[in-house]
Regions:
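Ser/Thr-rich, low-complexity intrinsically disordered terminal regions
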Residues: 1-114
């Protein structure tokens, strides 16, 4: 049985909410891509520059299976008003770490762009 977690505006921890910034989505997309490449245990599986979606795999550990992570940047073209959404899904393993996987991306991403 798998698990999942995605950023949600109702979360009390701001790092678990979608990130809204007055930045162009292309800049956030590039910053997100660079961060994924810098994170150990993360692999960038694909980057759809038109849809502004990164598909990643976060390697699992001894008890947790690998997580499939989608990072989606939305916002209007040419206007600095963007939102970053992150979703993690795990299909196997004894432990479900999806919330921790989202935090593993969002905490350094906040430092990088805020």
């Amino acid at each position: 049985m798998g698990g999942s977690f995605k950023t949600d505006p109702g979360q009390s921890n701001e790092r678990l909410r979608p990130l809204r910034l007055a930045m162009r989505r292309e800049h956030l997309f590039e910053a997100a891509k660079e961060l994924v490449e810098d994170l150990s245990s993360w692999v960038l599986d694909g980057a759809d520059e038109e849809a502004m979606v990164l598909s990643c795999t976060r390697a699992g550990g001894l008890l947790a299976g690998p997580s499939k992570v989608k990072i989606h940047i939305e916002g209007p073209d040419e206007i600095p008003n963007s939102t970053v959404h992150v979703k993690s899904e795990t299909e196997s393993g004894l432990l479900k770490r999806d919330k921790a996987v989202v935090l593993e991306f969002m905490v350094p991403f906040h430092r990088r762009v805020c």
